[in-house]
């Protein structure tokens, strides 16, 4: 499949870079969290509160299975999607996976800068929780096809496009 799949921690820039990549490549953008919100007619926060995290992860898995038939998409995943059910391996079947790596210190700055009420796992700007999440997830994220240090927006876009074209053999 010829898709780009963006993975990484919450606040790593997946949605922002995804929008720009989709414009550059003229691919449709699929944001898995937004898709789930539309399917459920509820916010992610409400879904977690009413049904719990396991229910949410089941919805993510259904989306992955639907995306296996798609091409020419930029897919921005929720931060936990690659982690659960060994989904990283399923994502690699869907397309070119890109881990947007952001240093923990930068993620903490981004979290503290704004209040992220919509993100159920980042409630109360808990830096210790974010640090623990980072440590638990990094090894799985690093299984992506390529790793981009996403601290410079324009450089990240250029690097992703180049790596994707190389992967495709262009």
Swiss-Prot record:
Its EC number is 2.7.1.71. Pfam families: SKI. It comes from the Bacteria. Keywords: Amino-acid biosynthesis, Aromatic amino acid biosynthesis, ATP-binding, Cytoplasm, Kinase, Magnesium, Metal-binding, Nucleotide-binding, Transferase. It catalyses: shikimate + ATP = 3-phosphoshikimate + ADP + H(+). One of its GO terms (molecular function) is shikimate kinase activity. InterPro entries: P-loop_NTPase (IPR027417), Shikimate/glucono_kinase (IPR031322), Shikimate_kinase/TSH1 (IPR000623). Transmembrane segments: none annotated. Substrate binds at residues 33, 57, 79, 137. ATP binds at residues 11-16, 119. It is found in: Cytoplasm. Monomer. This is Shikimate kinase. It comes from Clostridium botulinum (strain Hall / ATCC 3502 / NCTC 13319 / Type A).
């Amino acid at each position: 499949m010829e898709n780009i799949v963006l993975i990484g921690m919450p606040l790593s820039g997946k949605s922002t870079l995804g929008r720009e990549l989709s414009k550059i490549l003229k691919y449709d953008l699929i944001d898995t969290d937004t898709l789930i919100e539309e399917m459920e007619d509820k916010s992610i926060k409400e879904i977690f509160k009413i049904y719990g995290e396991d229910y949410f992860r089941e919805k993510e898995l259904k989306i992955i299975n639907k995306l296996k038939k798609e091409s020419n998409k930029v897919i921005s995943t929720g931060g936990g999607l690659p982690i659960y059910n060994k989904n990283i391996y399923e994502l690699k079947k869907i397309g070119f996976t890109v881990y947007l790596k952001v240093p923990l210190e930068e993620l903490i700055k981004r979290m503290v800068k704004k209040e992220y009420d919509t993100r159920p796992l980042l409630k109360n700007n808990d830096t210790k929780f974010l640090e623990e999440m980072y440590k638990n997830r990094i090894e799985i994220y690093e299984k992506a096809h390529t790793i981009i240090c996403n601290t410079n927006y324009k450089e990240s876009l250029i690097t992703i496009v180049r790596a994707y074209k190389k992967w495709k053999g262009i």
